[in-house]
A protein has these predicted regions:
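Non-catalytic architectural context of zinc metalloproteases
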Residues: 1-12, 85
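Metalloprotease/metallohydrolase-associated module, dominated by Zn2+-dependent proteases
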Residues: 9-65, 70-78, 101-193
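Short, small/polar residue-rich loop motifs at catalytic or cofactor-binding pockets
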Residues: 82
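Active-site recognition of the HExxH zinc-binding catalytic motif
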Residues: 86-99
Length: 193
């Protein structure tokens, strides 16, 4: 596997682009599991896709980060700080890269970024174009629609094959607010005033 040379750049970009939402616990465990599995079905265009195994960790007895473990094919989320759409999409992108797109690429490489940004674009109000432009300005590489060193396309899901069974209620925060760009930009607007 190639060296993960842009890992720190990816984390830095996520923190700058998404702000505090990235380290917020805004969904219940059930919302996280449903989102991950529905988003995975959408990606694969397969309503019968095997469920993605998701575990929840307490930050006092595990490393403080969430992660995907290829050996167990499991996503682990810190339940007190990482139950939100950004971290769920980040870890699901690792799962998709490992299982469906192209094993052997760097964990935070251009292919991973394309998958993650596609998920975030589909399931939040962040624009794919804005995220790619921002990431590339931060020197984070994002793959085009073809796999590196290959003529094969990175599979871009089609909305016509599987419509995710996610309602507005499924995407609400624990505080009953729906995750929207306005919600997440509001603290910055208040601070600037």
């Amino acid at each position: 596997m190639p060296r993960d040379t842009q890992k720190s750049k990816v984390y830095k970009w996520e923190k700058e682009f998404f702000g505090d939402i990235q380290r917020s616990s805004v969904w219940t465990e059930d919302q996280c599991v449903k989102y991950i599995n529905e988003a995975y079905k959408w990606w694969t265009s397969n309503k019968d896709a095997n469920p993605v195994k998701v575990n929840f960790l307490n930050d006092f007895n595990r490393p403080s980060s969430s992660y995907f473990r290829p050996a167990s094919n499991c996503i682990a989320l810190q339940k007190n700080i990482h139950t939100n759409p950004i971290v769920c999409s980040h870890e699901l992108a690792h799962y998709i890269q490992h299982n469906d797109v192209c094993r052997g690429e760097a964990w935070h490489g251009p292919v991973f970024m394309r998958v993650m940004l596609t998920l975030i674009d589909k399931f939040t109000e962040h624009s794919l174009g804005d995220m790619i432009k921002s990431a590339r300005a931060a020197k984070v590489k994002v793959a085009g629609l073809k796999r590196p060193n290959s003529n094969k396309a990175i599979r871009k899901p089609s909305n016509t094959f599987y419509i995710p069974k996610l309602t507005e209620k499924d995407l609400k925060f624990n505080s009953s607010e729906v995750y929207t760009r306005e919600w997440y930009e509001a603290p910055a607007k208040i601070a600037a005033a």
